[in-house]
């Protein structure tokens, strides 16, 4: 892969300008979009929480929580603005899942890791500040068995990275079209006008550090992480615009070789909201099962 094509792939990790026209739908839950102050990041971090139908009706009930991570170029409102909210309400209305919270934090271009230069410690923020904050602020159930993580594209990379690095914290992980590419592409620019493209990879160093990339890569982590008890689901389109199906196959092969149970699917489709919308329900049903929830009768 030449440098310009490599750059284009990662510039395009913004991938999806998610546009999905909302439709009339009787509300079955509630959305809160707020912010919290992070000492680690030295800034406010926005997040959106999707609260299940009975959240406001039963003030004593506690719920599992799914942390759902957005892709590059998106933000905490990904599920709210994309039509994902309608899909989630459909699942509740059709009684295909139990009730749990879904929380999406804004992650900018962090890839959900601590940056190479140490200035953007998003992983530390997420584990040390964000999880405790959400679980203090909302009526979540306590413990690993009631906490899942999932994501799309860059968010799929982040979900796998965080779950494989901290398997003691999560009972389940899902990733749709995760940004898995193996070895870091050779991306070098001498023209400062191209620095914006390189900036998309700045979290991995400037220039990007291949060794640092590999240390954080879910494909690397999957080879040795202690994944006992972690339920794993991932999928990708067979015509993924960025070739991420190859990385998904590689992850599948690694888990098979280690005899680690997981659910893996290659479906027809590319890297766009049409693909994600078609398969997001399966991921949410997977997490519902992992939480041990039965759909409401």
Where are these regions (language model features)?
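Non-catalytic cap/lid and distal C-terminal segments of serine-dependent acyl enzymes
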Residues: 25-297
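Intrinsically disordered, low-complexity regions enriched in serine, threonine, proline
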Residues: 2, 20-22
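Bacterial N-terminal signal peptides
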Residues: 9-19
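Bacterial N-terminal signal peptides that target proteins for export
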Residues: 1-11
């Amino acid at each position: 892969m030449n440098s310009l094509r490599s750059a284009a792939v990662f510039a395009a990790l913004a991938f999806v300008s998610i546009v999905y026209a909302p439709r009339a739908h009787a509300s079955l839950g509630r959305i809160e979009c707020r912010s919290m102050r992070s000492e680690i990041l030295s800034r406010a971090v926005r997040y959106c929480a999707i609260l299940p139908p009975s959240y406001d009706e039963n003030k004593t009930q506690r719920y599992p929580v799914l942390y759902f991570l957005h892709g590059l170029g998106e933000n905490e409102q990904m599920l709210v603005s994309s039509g994902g909210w309608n899909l989630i309400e459909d699942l509740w209305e059709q009684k295909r899942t139990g009730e749990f919270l879904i929380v999406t934090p804004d992650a900018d271009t962090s890839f959900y890791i601590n940056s190479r230069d140490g200035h953007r410690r998003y992983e530390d923020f997420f584990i040390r500040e964000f999880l405790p904050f959400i679980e203090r602020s909302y009526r979540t159930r306590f413990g690993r068995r009631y906490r899942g993580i999932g994501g799309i594209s860059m968010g799929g990379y982040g979900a796998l990275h965080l779950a494989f690095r901290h398997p003691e914290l999560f009972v389940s992980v899902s990733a749709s079209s995760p940004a898995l590419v193996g070895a870091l592409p050779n991306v070098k620019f001498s023209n400062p006008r191209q620095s914006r493209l390189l900036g998309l990879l700045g979290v991995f160093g400037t220039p990007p550090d291949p060794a640092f990339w590999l240390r954080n890569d879910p494909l690397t982590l999957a080879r040795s992480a202690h994944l006992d008890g972690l339920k794993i689901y991932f999928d990708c389109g067979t015509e993924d615009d960025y070739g991420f199906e190859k990385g998904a196959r590689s992850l599948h092969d690694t888990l098979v070789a280690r005899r680690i149970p997981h659910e893996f699917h290659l479906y027809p489709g590319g890297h766009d909201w049409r693909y994600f919308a078609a398969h997001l329900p399966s991921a949410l049903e997977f997490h519902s099962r992992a939480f041990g929830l039965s759909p409401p009768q």
